[in-house]
UniProtKB/Swiss-Prot annotation:
GO cellular component, one term: plasma membrane
Protein name (record): Putative arsenical pump membrane protein
Pfam families, alphabetized: ArsB
Native species: Bacillus subtilis (strain 168)
Lineage start: Bacteria, Bacillati, Bacillota, Bacilli, Bacillales
Family: Belongs to the ArsB family.
Biological process, per Gene Ontology: response to arsenic-containing substance
Amino acid sequence: MLAFFVTMIFIFWRPKGLNEAIPATFGALMVLLCGSVSLADLGEIGTKVTGASVTILATMIMAIALESFGFFYWVAAKLLQQSKGSGIKLFWLTNLLCFLMTIFLNNDGSILITTPILLLVLKYLGLKKHQKAPYLLSGVLIATASSAPIGVSNIVNLISLKIIGMDLYLHTAMMFVPSMMGLIFMTCLLFMFFYKRLPKSLPDIPGHFQSLRHRRYHPLHSPSAPLPERNQTKIMLFVLAFVFLVRMSLFAASYTGISVPLVAVIGSFILLSWRWIYFKTSPRDLLYKSPWHIFIFAFTMYVLIYGLHNIGFTELLVSYFEPVVSGSLAHATFASGISTSVFSNLFNNHPALMISTFTLTEMTLNPSTTKIIYLANIIGSDIGSLLLPMGTLATLIWMHILKQHDESISWGEYIKTTIIIIPLTVLFTLTCLYFWISWLFL
């Protein structure tokens, strides 16, 4: 327990920008030395974590390739162009962009990509600090919560899928509609909450993405030469269609029993090969841009949680929660979703969802109850965790990026928004999940 809490403190604190994989590794070594996890357990952990890590890493590599030829700047310029000088339209389009980035990539990648671009756009528009906050806050909340509809947008969701033995296709069939309704509900709440602070008109802007290109504002540097303007839109639409095809292929692979990580790797390889041929950009940049630490972080965090599991922590949770969730599907849905939300805000959603999933596997429940508890846990982990900034790694990354660019949104300002938005959204989404599963899957 001590190793877990010390590790979480350093992950939240991150002194001098310390990579989160480093304290997680030291924590895992402490657990191994204490004997809470055996060498045999490491092999089982590897089988659970490797596939999810490869899938997420392949997606991040695709994001790096897309950034290198200006795809995201092009998207941002189109967003501004379509807003047509309206701050209201820009709000809705910003949230749509953040949603799509998470759906096509993943939540952490979406934050890394959209936050610097939004900061650049908002600075370019000359908005005041109180006018920027609605776009930045709604963007991070929607980008992070958008990992709920499909399992491949969050590494912990993928790991939990493997633990519970549920395929990606079934997860999406059961989860997509209720979580999308929850996201729409959240966006509407955010719009009403921020309406008075949104600028009603914006200055005129050029549509071409080169006007937005600014090296300092993006963490993935060294873009290649700009595309010829006449070919720009055609090529970008082709790339967008390809990324969409790859995402759809992941679900097709899950449905047909093909390896999902293999499909993700093939998609990344094709995009990188095309970039090399068309733009003459060597894949060497991936050696220093790719987030290789994802493997280490995912593996070592799993070791820590497995240690808690082995010393009886999940048995304790089972003794408390099994009588509650066994009562009815409604009890199972709301008790699981709310408890995972609380754990996520106390410990971060990565360990919270793993603990919840381990606890679920120890319960003797019927298949329907098991599935709805798992999905409710996802809602608590992906949406409920947003109540506090430390609830997700994505929000911590977001705050770090803001600080890098001399922007600041305090914990107080963040919580002032989320204390209203998040509990209502969690309850609404859990209600949608309960009725959706009851009507169509029972």
